[in-house]
UniProtKB/Swiss-Prot annotation:
Belongs to the thymidylate synthase family. Bacterial-type ThyA subfamily. The gene is thyA. It comes from Shewanella sediminis (strain HAW-EB3). This is Thymidylate synthase. The lineage of its organism: Bacteria, Pseudomonadati, Pseudomonadota, Gammaproteobacteria, Alteromonadales. Its EC number is 2.1.1.45. Disulfide bonds: none annotated. It is found in: Cytoplasm.
């Protein structure tokens, strides 16, 4: 919680007002934030100064792992996070590449599991990473990238958290995750959970020990219609002791994650939190 609260206060104290063209709103913005999560010690970065819907965050990451491109598939897992971008973004609604209701296009996990090649084939980045790590191989390029500028026009949203770089030292697995943009009041609690859980899951299915996860954010911001709630409500609350995350040990392969895993395979214990805060969402 400490590094989360420090970033929120830094944005309020040092941020610059920037006009966001996509949303038509101003954002109080800082550049560069580095957060770390000790996954090996099970220091789960779950926000306690408001209720955090951690199951939705993990469900969304599971959808990325499966390469989903439809908001209905995310809803079936327990995440409604893509409903608005798939169905309420006017630019996407007018896009000829949109296939219909709930279609997200070639975003996030689609790129991670089926990156298009010039010869007409696809690259499954995640499978290559998992296969290498299971064999004890780190080629210094165990990189999962969702950022494909050549296909931005074929999706409803550019990826915010766009790259995950895995590194193996002995039998300990590390993760560096890179995020170009972060809606701190709404998105950061999700993103923290996702970075942590991604390392925990990939370590588990490759037979490695999880180490540290390093989370780099470039543009961290608070929208103008979120500022009062963050400054006058959430930051006035005292944080509780951190919770811990347990993952079903029967999850042993990428195929398991692709087929039968549900939110019932994840459990958070000791989660004390303040009341939920409904921050405005900007499509």
């Amino acid at each position: 919680m400490k590094q989360y609260l420090e970033l929120c206060n830094r944005i309020i104290d040092e941020g610059t007002w920037i006009e966001n063209e996509r949303t038509g709103k101003r954002c109080l913005t800082v550049i560069n934030a580095d957060l770390t999560y000790n996954v090996g010690n099970n220091e789960f970065p779950l926000i306690t100064t408001r209720k955090s819907f951690w199951k939705s965050a993990i469900a969304e990451m599971l959808g990325y792992i499966r390469g989903y491109d439809n908001a209905a598939d995310f809803r079936a897992l327990g995440a409604k996070t893509w409903d608005a971008n798939a169905n309420e973004n006017q630019v996407w609604l007018n896009n000829p590449h949109r296939k219909g209701v709930d279609d997200m296009g070639r975003v996030y996990g689609v790129q991670g599991r089926a990156w298009s090649k010039p010869d007409g084939g696809t690259v499954d980045q995640l499978k290559k990473i998992v296969d290498n790590l299971k064999a004890g191989v780190d080629d210094r390029g165990e990189i999962l990238s969702f950022y494909n500028p050549g296909e931005f026009h074929m999706g409803c949203l550019r990826p915010c958290m766009h790259t995950h770089n895995f590194s193996l030292l002995g039998d300990t697995l590390y993760l560096n995750s890179f995020q170009r943009s972060c809606d701190v009041p709404l998105g950061l609690n999700f993103n923290q959970v996702q970075v942590y859980t991604l390392l925990a899951l990939i370590a588990q299915i490759t037979g490695k020990k999880p180490g540290m996860a390093y989370h780099k954010i470039v543009n961290a911001h608070i929208y103008e219609d979120q500022l009062a709630l963050m400054r006058d409500v959430q930051l006035k609350r005292e944080p509780f002791e951190p919770a811990s995350l347990s993952i079903n040990p029967d999850i042993k392969s990428l195929e398991d994650l692709e087929t039968w895993v549900t939110m019932d395979d994840f459990e958070v214990s000791g989660y004390q939190h303040h009341e939920a805060i409904k921050y405005p969402f900007s499509v």
